[in-house]
Design a protein with these regions (language model features):
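Conserved catalytic core of the tyrosine transesterase superfamily
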Residues: 1-306
């Protein structure tokens, strides 16, 4: 896909995405997906055929890519075909794969404690504490600004996150203490001209932008390796662990739903499948077989009236 050929088409697609108020992350993903499709068919997407769509979907399947990523790529291609190019005949042939319902991978409280203890710097401890202590996504952590922190009420405001929704999350005393330490040590050479409330808590190297989620993921994996956690967890496991540990401690699932920003309670309810503390507290019916069966007490009948 040459820049000259793509430029007008890409501009039109961006305009269509802006008109529908798609967030920046979604737009980047859609553009990347369409570039991948164009590179595969070796031509501009506006000349694609039904056979091109079929071959591309087969190609993605043959690469061993996860169903989630295949769906994500084809969603971007579908947007281009259906919205920008008005090729409904082609977009209708893009199928959505049903994703297997996997149990979220979580860390135990001991593993989480070890992870935070071995974080190599104040910045790393704070970043990971925000992920676990507030149940934040990676993108939510790195995009925090001064204005989002309410130290008086111990609340962090998350603005326009997934699904373009705002929500409030808890701010623990330990995390607030780390935030205050970090603010004193945080590099400020790039803050000139930026109002205090708009300053990034974790600025990137170039200035003007926050640190990247890739940098945050690297810090997480370094800490996980140092803590001896070998079960393949990712940074998102901190969010899973936040929800699971709250559930095990008896927090109402509807409050957890609000803290995570889930639209549907069913999405939050999946953590009941990994709350090992709750599962272990339930007595198996097999163990009860050997116990003497309790007979129901007979109610004393009132004597008949004289």
């Amino acid at each position: 896909m040459s820049t000259t050929t793509l430029s007008p088409l890409r501009q039109r697609m961006i305009e269509d995405m802006n008109a529908r108020k798609l967030c920046a992350g979604t737009q980047r993903g859609h553009i990347s997906s369409c570039k991948r499709f164009a590179a595969f068919v070796k031509q501009s997407p506006d000349t694609a055929t039904l056979e091109d769509i079929r071959r591309f979907q087969l190609h993605l399947a043959e690469t061993g890519m996860s169903i989630c990523n295949r769906n994500r790529i084809m969603t971007g291609v579908r947007f281009l075909l259906r919205v920008t190019l008005r090729r409904l005949d082609l977009s209708a042939e893009i199928y959505h794969l049903r994703e297997p319902q996997k149990i979220p991978l979580v860390m135990s409280q001991d593993e989480t404690r070890r992870l935070l203890a071995v974080a190599g710097s104040l910045k790393a401890r704070l970043l990971l504490s925000l992920g676990y202590g507030c149940g934040l996504r990676a993108g939510e952590v790195v995009r925090l600004k001064v204005k989002h922190i309410d130290s008086a009420q111990k609340i962090i405001r998350i603005e326009q996150s997934k699904g373009r929704k705002d929500r409030n999350v808890m701010l623990s005393s330990k995390t607030l203490d780390l935030l205050r330490q970090w603010w004193k040590a945080r590099p400020s050479w790039h803050d000139a001209g930026t109002p205090l409330e708009e300053r990034w808590l974790f600025p990137g190297r170039g200035g003007g932008k926050p640190m990247t989620t890739r940098q945050l993921n690297r810090l997480f994996h370094e800490a996980a390796d140092a803590a001896g956690i070998r079960k393949g967890v990712t940074l998102h496991a901190l969010r899973h662990s936040f929800a699971t540990h709250l559930l095990e401690d008896g927090t109402d699932i509807r409050f957890i739903q609000a803290l995570l920003g889930h639209d549907k309670l069913d999405t939050t309810a999946r953590y009941t499948r990994v709350a090992t503390g709750m599962i272990a507290a339930i007595e198996s019916p097999l163990d009860r077989l050997s116990q003497p069966r309790k007979r129901p007490r007979k109610s004393r009948k009132n004597p008949p009236p004289a």
